[in-house]
Amino acid sequence: MTRVLLFLLRVYKVAFSPFVGAQCRFLPTCSDYARDAVLTHGPAIGSYLAAKRLCRCHPFAQGGYDPVPPAAGDAALRSTDSASTETTAADAPAARPSIHLPRP
């Protein structure tokens, strides 16, 4: 199922995206977000996350940097890693930069 979804996303990017133009207000683009979500979380949860993202992508959205959330197992591994450093509120802007895209 994952391969089918990735194939459909690739067909969209090659066949339809050039005609629609770059209109996504987020980074990564919605199609890249969908691909990353399916690869990170699997076809069911990845499709759900992609659908939520598509609902947030509209002309009145502020946009900006919106990465795929890490998988539950990835977050647990990072929190128990002794080499990882703790982040504070002062580090938050550096960890997630705010990118505002120009509006057409």
Swiss-Prot record:
Keyword entries, A-Z: Cell inner membrane, Cell membrane, Membrane
Membrane-spanning parts: none
A Pfam entry, by short name: YidD
Disordered: region residues: 71-104
Domain of life: Bacteria
Membrane topology: Peripheral membrane protein
Annotated InterPro entries: Membr_insert_effic_factor_YidD
UniProt-annotated location(s): Cell inner membrane
One Gene Ontology cellular component annotation held by this UniProt entry: plasma membrane
Bias (Low complexity): 78-98
Disulfide bonds: none
Family recorded in the similarity comment: Belongs to the UPF0161 family.
HAMAP family named in the record: UPF0161_YidD
Function description: Could be involved in insertion of integral membrane proteins into the membrane.
Descriptive protein name: Putative membrane protein insertion efficiency factor
Organism of provenance: Ralstonia nicotianae (strain ATCC BAA-1114 / GMI1000) (Ralstonia solanacearum)
